[in-house]
Amino acid sequence: MGRWICMYHTVPHARPSLADRRVFRIQPVTQFLATTTTFQHRASSEASYVPLEPGLLLLCCFYPIGNLILLVRLSLVLRNGSLVLPLSCV
C-alpha cells in the first residue's frame, strides 16, 4: 500500500494556489482525527497538527498506484461543534 498525499485549502469551491495549500503524507487514512481547531494524523511517532477553519475546508487525497494517481475528495462535516471526517474513501 502506498501513502496518502493530502492537499487542503480553506476556501470552499475554489482551486487552491501554491500559497494556499500544504502537502503532507499520512498512513493510514483511518488514523485521522478532527476537531474544530486542529487536524491531527498519527502516521508516525511525530503527530502533525494543522489548523482548521470550521466549515471552510476542502480536503483532497491523492493515492498513488503505480504510475497512476487517484484523486479522492473527502468531506468534513460540522456536527455539534466538531468536524467529522468520513473514513470511507470512495
UniProtKB/Swiss-Prot annotation:
The keyword Calcium does not apply. It is a single-pass membrane protein. The chain crosses the membrane at residues 55-77. It comes from the Eukaryota. It is found in: Membrane. Its main location: membrane. The keyword Membrane applies. Keywords: Glycoprotein, Membrane, Transmembrane, Transmembrane helix. Cluster 41 protein; part of the gene cluster 41 that mediates the biosynthesis of an extracellular and diffusible metabolite that is able to stimulate colony sclerotial production. This is Cluster 41 protein AFLA_114800.
